[in-house]
Amino acid sequence: MGIDNSFERGERTLNELAGWSVDAETIRRLCHAEAAKCRRSKGQRLDIATRFEKAPGDWELQIDAGKVNTETGWRDVKVATFAVREPAESCSSEDFAQRELPRPSVRHVIAGIEPAEQFGLRCQSEAQRIDLPAVKSLTILGDGAEWIWNLAHDRFSGAQQNLDVYHATQYLADLARAGFAAEPKASQDWTGRAQTALVADGWAGVCAFVHESLPQMPDRPSLEAAYPRVANYLSGHQDRMQYASRLHRGASIGSGMIEGAIKQLVGRRIKQTGARWKTDSISPLVEFISLGHTEEWDTYWSAM
């Protein structure tokens, strides 16, 4: 109680299901105390390294951040998920949206409200704890936040980097809205075809597609006005757009796992009550909540 739902909800649930009278404040204190204990004992839990070693598939590190209201104002809680995932069936740029990506064989979440440099050290330390076999075997996936790629370069030099394909597509959608302002259906169709070009040939594919479609664009001046911003952004990530080769190998090209974690751990649980949280309490609680959705949860409690 208090992990997936508010402490007040936990109080009501315990009373309804077990007839126990435990107030929300007690549940809050116990949850935070156990979360802090769980983080302190992390170094003693060696089973996670064994799980990663035995897990079949490719290594991923997905990174993102979410906003949390703290006693010092709104802060970024940075979250990273290490995972090993078996490859999906090989597919092309035309049918990748329909492919079924296997669930991770194993995953592990870390979090921190701290500068990116410090969080990078946390990620590096965790990679060592779970026995990352070699940096070159790792793929780092994320959106366009500069701190993510600085972290990747500084702490995991040699790892493959992948810009989330759906994040990149949002920029293509901006172009479409500019060129098809009065035609939402046409805008959507154009975005889909632009995404196919992006996935097939990266930034070069986008350039060719935009050039070829200009004569048919209803509002060409607006698209041309919007293009420099999109070009400046996407061209800076062209080395992170090896989507076609990754699809051929059955690898991930999106960071949906970490975005889902942010939505579940931060958006749904941390923000749902509108409470202001103590900065020192957030990171251990986010990690503790995530533990509850993995096989580590049972192992953690069985060791008590």
What is the predicted function of each stretch?
Residues 1-304:
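Catalytic center-proximal scaffold of phosphoryl-transfer enzymes
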